[in-house]
């Protein structure tokens, strides 16, 4: 009897203890920790809204963003009030380094160039934030830390060296020729016509990355990237919801579809990778695509360490990097291209200057790698497009342990956000024409335009700078050169200016342009 009572009271004690521990953790998570971090940030002179239970600023930010996007904006490149209105408001109210509440986590917004440079250069002391929902979309180099990141960066670097890009240039050309032919087929007998170029440019960049990621497995690669595009749309539609506690455990139709896509993509990539591995083991020549170069680099790493497979990437690692090829290779380049065409439509003098240079170098011949590197006007235009419409609107890092930036002490548990677009549109940093299209500012290069300050980083910066930026810029130069050779273009009266922040800044209502064939 006494033994039974002892067991009974023991169970009650354990249950009560576990209940108290769980209650404490929940209380700390939803209230005590956020309020403690808020107090510490305010002591550093940083200000923002007071913490609100669980959701923080999410609800207000969502409502303001929805209102800002409720109708097209005027034809202007001052897009910040439309794409990040809430962050803009916080900076206006609270000064240069305010904080915003991403649910229960305070996110410190840094807008001072020296602090931003410090953050981006301290890779080993800061982490990439881990949002569960993004696991559906990508893994690989972008989320790795420490030694694993260093190893993957080293192995992938072989695929993005300039001599490798030179080999890939003809496949860029093939994809561009296909797109130009499709555009020509839509023109009327007088050589003019209206099209929405946005879907075409998305297909172009998807085509390019499919050819250059998977080579002979191009068709299967294209199907995978179509699935990735659908997954990206689902992720962004549910991003705010995913920050609500326990959201991922709710069995919705969207959740089921995201899991289905993830499973399909992973199994398809495994099939392609295993097929390529078998071909390489059989002595077949390595294909000069990103997958082939990555696998060859991986095999070399294993051989250099006495055939120790633990020193290379696992199959799961390679799958993750292949997913990343899409995100890096498709999203950023397609948006760069669409905004380039929109801006050149609005500024015909720059369109003509770029066309004259392209025709001077190539005439009616197809662009090649050597000729693209001789262009001066077009790179200036692309740099300015990336300044006004950067692929990523900001960079986020997680503070895992207390750290100091300049004179500012930032406590562990805070996220640091670097708003690329705010810096690149800042009148104090770029002059009174900061929100206007003026490629002339890059006439003597990026360093001269920025006066050596860290105020321009469309592809990120520091050790984690995007390693695919040369791939993206080469593709953009090839595509725009061919478009200029073949078409004059201007905005259609039906064009609605609707910059929209999805994964990147995209034209929500498309990009309707009138094309006119250039006479041979």
Swiss-Prot record:
The keyword Cell membrane does not apply. One of its GO terms (cellular component) is membrane. Pfam families: p450. CDD domains: CYP72 (cd20642). It is a single-pass membrane protein. Heme binds at residue 466. Its main location: membrane. Its EC number is 1.14.13.-. This is Cytochrome P450 716A67. It comes from Medicago truncatula (Barrel medic). The gene is CYP72A67.
């Amino acid at each position: 009897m006494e033994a039974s009572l002892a067991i009974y009271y023991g169970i009650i004690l354990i249950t009560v203890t576990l209940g108290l521990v769980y209650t404490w953790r929940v209380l700390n998570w939803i209230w005590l920790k956020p309020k403690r971090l808020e107090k510490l940030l305010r002591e550093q002179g940083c200000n923002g809204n007071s913490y609100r239970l669980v959701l923080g600023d999410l609800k207000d930010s969502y409502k303001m963003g929805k209102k800002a996007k409720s109708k097209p904006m005027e034809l202007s490149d001052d897009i910040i009030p439309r794409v990040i209105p809430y962050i803009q408001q916080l900076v206006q109210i609270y000064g240069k380094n305010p904080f915003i509440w991403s649910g229960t986590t305070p996110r410190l917004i840094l807008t001072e160039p020296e602090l931003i440079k410090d953050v981006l250069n301290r890779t080993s002391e800061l982490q990439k934030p881990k949002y569960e929902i993004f696991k559906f979309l990508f893994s690989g180099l972008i989320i790795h830390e420490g030694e694993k990141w260093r190893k993957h960066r080293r192995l992938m670097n072989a695929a993005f060296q300039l001599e490798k890009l030179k080999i890939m240039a003809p496949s860029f050309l093939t994809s561009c020729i296909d797109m130009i032919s499709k555009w020509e087929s839509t023109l009327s007998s007088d050589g003019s016509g209206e099209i929405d170029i946005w879907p075409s440019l998305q297909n172009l960049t998807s085509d390019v990355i499919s050819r250059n990621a998977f080579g002979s497995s191009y068709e299967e690669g294209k199907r995978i990237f179509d699935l990735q595009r659908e997954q990206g749309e689902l992720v962004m539609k549910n991003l705010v919801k995913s920050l609500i506690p326990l959201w991922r455990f709710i069995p919705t139709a969207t959740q089921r579809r995201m899991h289905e896509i993830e499973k399909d993509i992973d199994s398809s990539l495994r099939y392609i990778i295993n097929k390529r591995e078998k071909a390489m083991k059989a002595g077949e020549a390595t294909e000069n695509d990103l997958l082939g170069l990555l696998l060859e680099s991986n095999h070399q790493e294993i051989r250099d360490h006495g055939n120790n497979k633990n020193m290379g990437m696992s199959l799961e690692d390679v799958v993750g990097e292949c997913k990343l090829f899409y995100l890096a290779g498709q999203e950023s380049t397609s948006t760069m291209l669409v905004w380039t065409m929109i801006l050149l439509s609005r500024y015909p003098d720059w369109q003509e200057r770029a066309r004259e240079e392209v025709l001077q170098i190539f005439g009616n011949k197809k662009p090649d790698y050597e000729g693209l590197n001789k262009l001066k006007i077009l790179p200036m235009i692309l740099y300015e497009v990336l300044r006004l419409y950067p692929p990523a609107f900001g960079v986020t890092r997680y503070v895992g342990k207390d750290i100091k930036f300049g004179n500012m002490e930032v406590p562990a548990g805070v996220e640091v956000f670097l708003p690329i677009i705010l810096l690149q549109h800042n009148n104090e940093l770029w002059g009174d024409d900061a929100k206007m299209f003026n490629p002339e500012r890059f006439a003597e290069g990026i360093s001269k335009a920025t006066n050596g300050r860290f105020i321009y980083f469309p592809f990120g910066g520091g050790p984690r700078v995007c390693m695919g930026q040369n791939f993206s810029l080469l593709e953009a130069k090839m595509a725009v050169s061919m478009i200029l050779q073949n078409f004059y273009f201007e905005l259609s009266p039906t064009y609605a200016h609707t910059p929209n922040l999805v994964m990147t800044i995209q034209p929500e209502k498309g990009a309707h342009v009138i094309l006119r064939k250039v006479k041979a």
